[in-house]
């Protein structure tokens, strides 16, 4: 039986490409999988997909790949270490960006560009960026290398042009909420981080604005409570941020027991939750851009603080400062089919989409695959790390 008589040489046969992701579903997989599938089809090669935290050192030694793909080389130390080790072992290395909506922190873009990579050195042979705006940011860094940094567009957003998502009836029936014909999604924020003294995100990103953001949590809790009470005919899908752990810092804690509320965290894909709603409301959420790609209206509810270190994506949604005006916007949508304040920002949204994700044509994965194919087939390894 050939399946039981294989030697070690067969078991550890060198693979063409080894891909590492942070999880088996969600953002990282959405980023790399369309590209991997195209590479498999175009090049007729073997690609092995592995969980980053399984044992990336063992996997690189075991499979001896010609090329390693890392969905993100800066977001956590393991991603960076996998990139460095693969390069050290002579593998060609390609990295994507998990969060490419860069912003300045303390007057610098360095933290967003390099994360844990304090040496600000690109260990990869090819780094694919979301937008030309990001590449211009990179040009201000000592780590910029025109031969390595290329523009593909944000591949993780291609799905909004290529795929179909769960319909409203299917999702609502699943949770026995199918009697509702009006659906509003409330997108959660990481208030957890703002109150956690051991987490650096709050102080680093917001500085003196932090207290206003903390106060916003309690205003949102009260505002959402009033909104839910006043609209029993609307289903509010409260989508907690996936990293929220402490219920005390959850903006939805006061509405959990209402019959017109569905609390979700990681049970459903965020794009399905967006797809079934009419309006998406958030304190601050880059998910708003994804809602635009699905032709949804978005509103930002900021009752305490409106100006802080926030994504440029916020400029594409009306900022509502009190519950009365939030209610008026919702009423306007359900009576007219639109919200004028939202419609007035159409040109802003088109510019934001270009600035943030590069392209919204569903072809970012094709551009990325073309760069990787060129590296795989033609180019010598660019990054050499001596042991």
Question: Model regions: which residues?
Answer:
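Conserved catalytic-core segment of nucleotide-activated headgroup transferases in glycan assembly
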Residues: 158-252
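Alpha-helix C-terminal capping/helix-to-coil transition sites in glycosyltransferase folds
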Residues: 7, 64, 123, 275-276
């Amino acid at each position: 039986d050939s399946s039981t008589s294989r030697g070690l040489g067969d078991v550890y046969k060198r693979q063409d490409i080894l891909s590492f992701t942070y999880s088996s579903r969600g953002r990282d997989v959405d980023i790399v999988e369309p590209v991997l599938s195209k590479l498999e089809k175009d090049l007729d090669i073997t690609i092995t997909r592995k969980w980053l935290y399984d044992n990336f050192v063992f996997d690189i030694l075991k499979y001896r790949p010609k090329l390693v793909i890392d969905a993100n080389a800066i977001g956590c130390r393991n991603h960076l270490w996998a990139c460095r080790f693969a390069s050290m072992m002579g593998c060609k290395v390609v990295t994507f960006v998990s969060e490419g909506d860069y912003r300045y922190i303390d007057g610098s873009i360095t933290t967003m560009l390099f994360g844990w990579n304090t040496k600000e050195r690109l260990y990869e042979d090819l780094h694919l960026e979301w937008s030309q705006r990001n590449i211009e940011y990179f040009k201000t860094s000592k780590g910029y290398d025109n031969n390595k940094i290329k523009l593909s567009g944000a591949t993780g957003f291609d799905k909004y042009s290529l795929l179909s998502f769960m319909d409203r009836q299917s999702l609502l029936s699943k949770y026995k909420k199918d009697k509702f014909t009006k659906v509003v999604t409330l997108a959660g924020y990481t208030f957890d981080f703002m109150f956690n003294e051991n987490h650096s995100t709050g102080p680093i990103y917001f500085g003196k604005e932090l207290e206003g953001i903390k106060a916003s949590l309690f205003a949102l809790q009260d505002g959402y409570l009033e909104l839910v009470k006043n609209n029993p005919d609307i289903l509010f899908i409260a989508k907690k941020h996936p990293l929220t752990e402490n219920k005390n810092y959850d903006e939805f804690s006061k509405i959990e027991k209402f019959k017109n509320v569905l609390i979700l965290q990681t049970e459903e894909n965020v794009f399905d939750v967006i797809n079934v709603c009419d309006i998406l409301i958030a304190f601050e959420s880059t998910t708003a851009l994804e809602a635009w790609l699905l032709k949804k209206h978005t509103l930002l509810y900021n009752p305490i603080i409106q100006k802080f270190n926030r994504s440029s994506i916020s400029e594409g949604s009306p900022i509502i400062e009190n519950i009365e005006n939030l209610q008026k916007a919702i009423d306007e949508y359900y009576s007219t089919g639109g919200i004028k304040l939202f419609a007035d920002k159409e040109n802003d949204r088109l510019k934001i989409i270009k600035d943030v994700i590069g392209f919204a044509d569903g072809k970012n994965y094709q551009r990325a695959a073309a760069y990787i194919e060129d590296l795989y087939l033609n180019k010598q390894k660019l990054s050499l790390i001596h042991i």
